[in-house]
Amino acid sequence: MSSQPFTNKVIALTGSASGIGLETAKLLASRGARLSLADIQEDKLKELQAQLESEYYVDVITTKVDVRKFGEVEAWINKTIDNFGKLDGSANLAGVAPESIGLKGIVEQDLDEWEFVLGVNLTGTMNSLKAQLKVMANNGSIVNASSIRGLTGAAKNASYSSAKHGIIGLTRTAAKEVGGKGIRVNAICPGRISTPMLKTAENSIGLHLQPGSANYPPIALGRDGEAKEVAQLVAFLLSDESTYISGADISIDGGWRC
């Protein structure tokens, strides 16, 4: 396999400024992709752009986007087409966890928090798909970020789990709609991945799980995953090595659900 399998491929990413999105941007740049990066954190995007351009000599554009707002998402994708002339793939990785995760059940659910979490995670993914599929090249590929919580229930995690379940349904629906164009749409379902979002969630409840501790989840590999490991899966699904995979929800959880 070529060390630059994404040469001349244009890939759009949300959630690019941190965590899985950041590592995915780095990996794709190292493999020759031309990138259109979106995130709400504009300063971090600019820092990443400078790093990728200097280290990998690839074309990168960045856009501050609130994925809850379709107008902003559509403007970003239009900017991508204006700059690069096409869109070969996208990874919709923007996501948030609720501050009340692990603390409040459904009876105590705050409606503003519910709307925010579903807005970023689920509506944000729908907005991204809506804009991307209008211009996606035939035989393109899209990866959406679900979660292990999109496959299983979890007490005191209603908004996040509901959003991530919804992303799987949205992914399957999109795959059925655009398969005739050769466009593939898949969802990844990460487990415990060492990211800023995981740290923030654990800080909010004052609980820091360590491998080997009594309350650590039953993960077969006995450790948290790294964001760069998830990036490898995203890159695989965007690549020509996965041309018969579509409508799938693929776990990357170290053997948590097995």
From Swiss-Prot:
The active site is at residues 146, 160, 164. Pfam families: adh_short_C2. Keywords: NADP, Oxidoreductase, Virulence. It is an enzyme of class 1 (oxidoreductase). The keyword Cell cycle does not apply. Its EC number is 1.1.1.-. Signal peptide: none annotated. It comes from the Eukaryota. GO terms for molecular function: oxidoreductase activity. Induction: Constitutively expressed at a low level. CDD domains: SDR_c (cd05233). One of its GO terms (biological process) is abscisic acid biosynthetic process. Disruption phenotype: Reduces the production of abscisic acid (ABA) and accumulates a compound that corresponds probably to 1',4'-trans-diol-ABA. Pathway: Hormone biosynthesis. Gene3D superfamilies: NAD(P)-binding Rossmann-like Domain (3.40.50.720). Short-chain dehydrogenase/reductase; part of the gene cluster that mediates the biosynthesis of abscisic acid (ABA), a phytohormone that acts antagonistically toward salicylic acid (SA), jasmonic acid (JA) and ethylene (ETH) signaling, to impede plant defense responses. The first step of the pathway catalyzes the reaction from farnesyl diphosphate to alpha-ionylideneethane performed by the alpha-ionylideneethane synthase aba3 via a three-step reaction mechanism involving 2 neutral intermediates, beta-farnesene and allofarnesene. PANTHER family: DEHYDROGENASES, SHORT CHAIN, ESTRADIOL 17-BETA-DEHYDROGENASE 8-RELATED. This is Short-chain dehydrogenase/reductase aba4. It comes from Botryotinia fuckeliana (strain B05.10). The gene is aba4.
